[in-house]
Amino acid sequence: MGLADFKDVDRNELSMIEVAHAILEDRGERMAFADIVNEVQKYLNKSDEEIRQRLPQFYTDMNTDGRFISMGENVWALRTWFKFEAVDEEVDHPEDDGDEESTRKHHKKVNAFLATTEGDDVIDYENDDPEDEDLSDDSDADEDDADDNSGDDYDDNEDDDDDDSLLDGIEDQLSQMDDDDLDDDEDEE
C-alpha cells in the first residue's frame, strides 16, 4: 500500500497517519519526523496553520500506532521492515553512545559475603538496625543522669480516689445487674 492506493480517494478524508504510512512505504527508508510532516502537508494540500494544529495528535498517533517505530533522534521507520528480534538492536540509544570498554573497567564486582574485613566494601549486617543506634554520647550520659529527675516527669496522683467517682459519666447511666437479678430472670422463664 502506498500513495498510489489513495488516487481515487478524496484527500480531505485521509488522516495524516495513513498518508505518513504510505509515504514511508513508498520511500522504503527511515525518515525524520519533520520530513514526514512536510511530505504529508504537500500530499494533503494543508496550510501551515492546519498542520500546526494537528501536529500534537499526529505525533501521538505515530507513537501509539503499532505500524511505526521510532529509531531515535526523531527518525521514524515502519515496524514491518525489521524482524521482531532486531527491533531493539536497530534503535539508536543516545545514552549508550559512551565508550563501552571504559564503563566496563570502572565497574568492580564486590562480594558482600566475604569473610574477611580487609576493605570498606564489606557490609556489616549486624549493624543495620537504626533502632539499635545510641543517640547520645557515652560521655554525656553521666551528666544527663545527674540532671535527669525522671520521677518528676510523672505525677504520683495521691488523690486516686477521685478517679473512682465520675460525675454524670456513662457508668452512672448504666444499670448494674446483681446475681439476684439474674436468678429472678431465670425463674420467670
UniProtKB/Swiss-Prot annotation:
Mind telling me which Gene3D superfamilies this protein's record contains?
RNA polymerase, subunit delta, N-terminal domain (1.10.10.1250)
Give me the ranges of the annotated region Disordered.
Answer: 90-189
**Protein keywords:** DNA-directed RNA polymerase, Nucleotidyltransferase, Transcription, Transferase
Q: Name one Pfam family in it.
A: HARE-HTH
- Listed InterPro entries: Asxl_HARE-HTH (IPR007759), RNAP_delta_N_dom_sf (IPR038087), RpoE (IPR029757)
Q: Does the keyword DNA-binding apply?
A: no
Gene (name only): rpoE
Biological processes per GO annotation: DNA-templated transcription; regulation of DNA-templated transcription
Q: What PROSITE patterns does this protein's entry cite?
A: HTH_HARE (PS51913)
Please state what the protein is called. Probable DNA-directed RNA polymerase subunit delta
Q: Which family does it belong to?
A: Belongs to the RpoE family.
So what does this one do? Participates in both the initiation and recycling phases of transcription. In the presence of the delta subunit, RNAP displays an increased specificity of transcription, a decreased affinity for nucleic acids, and an increased efficiency of RNA synthesis because of enhanced recycling.
Keyword Nucleotidyltransferase on entry: yes
The family database entries (NCBIfam families) matched by this protein are listed as: RNAP_delt_lowGC (TIGR04567)
- An MF annotation (GO) of this entry: DNA-directed RNA polymerase activity
Which stretches does UniProt call biased (Acidic residues)?
90-100, 118-189
Q: How does it assemble?
A: RNAP is composed of a core of 2 alpha, a beta and a beta' subunits. The core is associated with a delta subunit and one of several sigma factors.
Taxonomic superkingdom: Bacteria
Ranges of residues in domain HTH HARE-type:
14-81
